[in-house]
Amino acid sequence: GARAAYQVGVLLAIRDVWGKRPGNPFPILCGTSAGAVNAVALAVFSANFDEAVRKLAYIWRNFRVDHVYRADTLAIAESVMRWGSAVFLGWLIHQSPRSLLDNSPLGALLESQLDFGAIDRSIAAGHLRAISVTASGYTSGESLAFFQGHEALQPWRRAQRVGVRTQLKVEHLLASSAIPFVFPAVPASTRLWRSST
């Protein structure tokens, strides 16, 4: 997260040079984890770089922990109970907890702030060539690059790397931001990959 906030500082400096010109100085955007959130925000607002950077700066300046995960007493107690049950009664309940923290607030924030349909409109208007969000396949060991872009761009497969053409959504950002044991892995990343190929 700290690196993503730093990225916005760099974007503010670039915005000062770019000025109020329409469009976007970055035709290809890529990101992982919180950097993927920044990249998708730039893609969504790529018709107006100044507006995109202003919105990103506003979000990062007002960012709080409860925008990412539930930090209330009830959520922490539920997590302690889930993990305690798994440690002491795991043989009996046959279910492991998915993660230490519940990051559903992050999903809700992204859903409310990002119009993913704007990505196709930006590509069609020529403001954007492609956007890629990379996630790790923890069971496969593959790096999954989910991309949306110009029709000439093709999916790819290399050693431990797969490029998957798709319509980006919140699930891709959550998959990219997953941290083993801390934030839940997104089982949908495998499903999203299989349904896109």
Q: Which residues make up each language-model segment?
A:
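Active-site gating loop/helix substructures
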Residues: G107, A124-T197
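Patatin-like phospholipase
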Residues: A2-R98, S104, L110, F147-A159, ...
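Extended, Lys/Arg-enriched charged tracts that mediate electrostatic binding to polyanionic substrates
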Residues: L106-L109, L114-A118
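Short polar catalytic/cofactor-binding loops
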Residues: G1-A2, T139
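A short alpha-helix-loop-beta-strand transition element characteristic
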Residues: D66-L74, D115-A130
